[in-house]
Amino acid sequence: MASALCSPCHHHHHRPFNYRRLRASPSSHARPRSGTSGPSGSTTAKYLCSRPMSTSRGGSVTCSSTEASKSKQGPDHLLILVHGIMASPSDWTYGEAVLKKRLGGNFVIYASSSNIYVKTFDGIDVAGRRLAKEVLDVVQKMDGLRKISFIAHSLGGLFARYAISILYSLKEKEMGSSSSVMPTIGGSEISGHTPGLGVIAGLEPINFITLATPHLGVRGKNQLPFLQGLSILEKLAAPLAPFIVGRTGAQLFLTDGEPSKPPLLLLMTSDHDDTMFISALAAFKNRILYANVSYDHMVGWKTSSIRRELDLRKPLHRSVGGYKHIVNVEYCSPVSSDGPHFPSRAARAKEAAQSTPNTENTEEYHKMMEEEMIHGLQRVGWKKVDVNFHASLWPYSAHNNIHVKNEWVHNAGAGVIAHVADSIKQTCLQASL
């Protein structure tokens, strides 16, 4: 069976980033969002329109001189930040500040607030639709936007994948006019798909980035490490998940829906009449996966990097490219495939996993689904960035370190956020050439 062709990415060594603590400050150019508030008086998401700022070296952090000149007319690139389970926009406080400082004035940075806290339990599909509506609201309220990117942590990556399938349109905007674009959807065509076909919320899709996202669901010690491979815990996890984390739990364990129907995460690896999951991903110029190779007890290395067990190698420890805790970067080319399937034996395995959730039944079912999901997702290319917090003060906080959930507790991930920002900046530079 086809396996993704991955090659290492070569780094240019950057001067070390000054990992001083940064706090986001409201921009004088920000346009406040009106009419929204979270439950119990929670703080709503806000616009952070990044403007050119002086660095500690006295330079101006912008994508290019061309982008800097554009910023005088206002930012045109919308960057959506999506938090994970039982979280809120405040998870991105540090990330917003760093992105604002490093990216310059051509970006509107917006932290999503439509799925805060227990709303993340309502289901990936429900949360994805909420996020899609929120993004449309933002786009409609902002003038001059031309491009869109997403950065999502953990479960938020699945919300974002669902949302872009709704926001995807087979139209290209050209100087106020639009022309239909009709790419073919078959496996081989998608694998050779040229980024740039189609738009997201009417904007040109640029970057789709996830950090520690369970793209293949959660099951067993390699997908949900805190179970420690103990059969009793694995046996209890799936049936209890819906009671603890609602519909979202069943979807993550691939046990949602009728036995005869494929689970949502499998559906999300192919195109359908009303939701173009793979075409939406393929429309982005760059797709990047950040994955913890160890110490992440919520989301395992395999599921967050969309790899098979045999593709996992011994974790590396030496940082690359001058970014602390980034230990490996590689690009996996798209692989031709006829797409994912849900054969009758998978339906029988799902029924067994639902009715008698012992380790043997669930493992057989999940292995089948895992392979099918990989078949679907590898039809687009991915840049994969492996992260290892083995040398940090709190390595077991890897799941929250990777996006610096709290700048005082999880600041070991500062190098990861810097790498994310510079990856986006590199895209800007390439586009301006």
Task: Show the residue positions of the predicted features.
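Flexible, membrane-associating and regulatory peripheral segments of lipid-active enzymes
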Residues: 1-144, 281, 366-367, 377-397, ...
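Aromatic/acidic cage segments in peptide-binding pockets
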Residues: 96-107, 130, 176-180, 224-240, ...
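C-terminal catalytic-base region of ester-bond hydrolases, centering on the histidine
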Residues: 271-433
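N-terminal cationic amphipathic segment used for targeting or macromolecule association
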Residues: 22, 28, 43, 236, ...
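Beta-sheet entry/capping signal
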Residues: 78, 108, 207, 287-288
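Single-residue recognition of alpha-helix boundary sites
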Residues: 94, 165, 223, 262, ...
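Serine-dependent carboxylesterase/thioesterase catalytic core
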Residues: 83, 112-117, 125-264, 269, ...
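Patatin-like phospholipase
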Residues: 2, 44-51, 55, 62-71, ...
